[in-house]
Design a protein with these regions (language model features):
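P-loop NTPase Walker
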Residues: 1-39, 43, 115, 139, ...
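ATP-hydrolysis module of ASCE/P-loop NTPase motor domains
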Residues: 8-15, 32-122, 145, 209, ...
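Conserved beta-strand -> loop -> alpha-helix junction used to position metal-binding or nucleic-acid-contacting
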Residues: 12-26, 44-45, 305-326
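Conserved helicase NTPase motor core
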Residues: 16, 42-49, 95-197, 212-216
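Conserved helicase C-terminal RecA-like lobe
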Residues: 94, 279, 293-305, 318, ...
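Helicase P-loop NTPase motor core
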Residues: 203-206, 211-306, 329-333, 365, ...
């Protein structure tokens, strides 16, 4: 988005530049009332939906650590990437426990709907449902955009492609950028056939091959071209670069991670020892996932070589940030039990699992969200008095903050600061 602003200037503020999920969230804030959701519905991230799936599995008499929990999460994701909700699934008799999977999937959806929440996959699926079943809404949004540009098109899955087609039917100019050779998200539903099928689906398609590479040197591109040439189902093209020189590509294979680490650290010592200009801060080791660092760290430490690990959690994935956001999710959506469960003991209010189960049970019986329920607990509640006092203090703090937000007489940042430090 920042790059677009630099290229086109202030007029960039009139553009919609976002991901599929961000666009659908924006769409649903306006149109989800058609499905019975308020504009303030909650959006569950992967951690939130994972906890809800665990809860469903536990209620089905499984343990959180049982393999079926991970299997259920993967099952739900696969089905949603195909655009299938529980009622759309035809149970496969050869899939040993699919009937149980569908039942747990259905319970996951029920809990999520009761909490007026959607997960990331819902954002696209519910947008699709509205566009397909409410022609006046589809026309309103498809005529809004005369030009639709899709980047990294090779990573598009079937439901995203259906969304693109629904938004581009009314004289919309469709422009896609993608490289079938870079399809790396098939595990997440990306379908390479979509981009390869474009010439057939759009007979007037104008195809522009961009094959000059500005990042790599010739030795790297020669290896890449040679490897990818073995794939016969592709758009033929050879990458080239105007950059001269470049070191040859070296490929090594090891039977153990420790052997790999030993080799890499040996090479680091060779490089550092060749020249006074070659300092350790100019050398980087890249890895695919953070768990792979262990043998490298062990070997570097063993030899007394200095190193730093870069990376870690994104800002919005940090615990303290998610805790604060959970408080505000409860304020705008009192039915968001997932957010409430996260903050009820942050900071510690000494509310144990048994007391929390009582809250859940009584709130469910009252057909209320957990926060809605603790705002007006009936006199015959089984919640212990000590817990009621702690909950009362929580409600008082939340409602005071809500009043300040609704008055709109102060900067949100000031209210947030007071809320955190209080």
């Amino acid at each position: 988005k920042e790059r677009v602003e630099k290229l086109v200037g202030s007029s960039a503020s009139f553009l919609t530049v976002c991901t599929f999920h961000s666009f659908c969230a924006r769409f649903l804030r306006r149109e989800a009332y058609l499905l019975g959701f308020p504009p303030s519905f909650s959006i569950l991230d992967d951690e939130d939906s994972g906890k809800l799936i665990q809860e469903v599995a536990v209620e089905a008499n499984y343990k959180k650590s049982d393999p079926i929990v991970k299997e259920l999460r993967s099952y739900i994701s696969r089905k949603k990437n195909k655009g299938e909700y529980p009622d759309d699934i035809k149970v496969n008799p050869f899939y040993v426990n699919e009937k149980e999977m569908v039942d747990m999937y259905k319970e996951y959806e029920r809990k999520k709907d009761n909490a007026l929440s959607m997960d990331f996959d819902d954002l696209i699926l519910k947008t699709l449902y509205i566009l397909k079943n409410y022609p006046e809404v589809r026309q309103k949004w498809s005529t809004r955009y005369k030009h639709l540009l899709i980047d990294e098109f090779q990573d598009t899955n079937n439901v995203q492609y259906e969304l693109i087609n629904l938004l581009s039917v009314d004289n919309t100019n469709l422009y896609v950028v993608g490289d079938p050779d870079q399809t790396i998200y098939t595990w997440r539903g990306a379908n390479q056939k979509i981009i390869l099928d474009m010439p057939r689906r759009y007979p007037d398609l104008e195809d522009v091959i961009l094959n000059e590479n500005y990042r790599s040197t010739s030795p790297i591109l020669n290896v890449a071209n040679s490897l990818i040439s073995h794939n016969k189902k592709r758009v033929p093209k050879d990458l080239f670069t105007s950059q001269s020189g470049g070191l040859p590509v070296i490929v090594k294979s090891f039977s153990k991670a420790e052997e790999e680490a030993d080799y890499v650290v040996n090479e680091i010592e060779k490089i550092a020892g060749k020249s006074s200009d070659a300092v350790y801060s100019n050398i980087a080791v890249l890895y695919r996932s953070s768990y792979l660092t262990r043998p490298f760290e062990a070997e570097l430490a063993h030899r007394g070589l200095p190193y730093r690990i870069f990376g870690g959690l994104r800002f919005y994935q940090r615990k303290e940030v998610k805790d604060v956001l959970a408080y505000f999710r409860v304020l705008v959506n009192p039915k968001d039990d997932i957010a409430f469960d996260r903050i009820v003991n942050v900071p510690s209010r000494k509310i144990g699992a048994a007391s929390l189960e009582i809250i859940k049970k009584e709130a469910t019986e009252a057909k209320l969200g957990e926060y809605e329920y603790i705002k007006n607990v009936p006199s015959d509640s089984e919640i212990p008095n000590r817990i009621l006092v702690a909950l009362g203090a929580l409600v008082s703090k939340m409602e005071k903050t809500k009043e300040r937000l609704q008055e709109r007489s102060e900067a949100y940042s000031a209210i947030l600061k007071d809320f955190i430090t209080d």
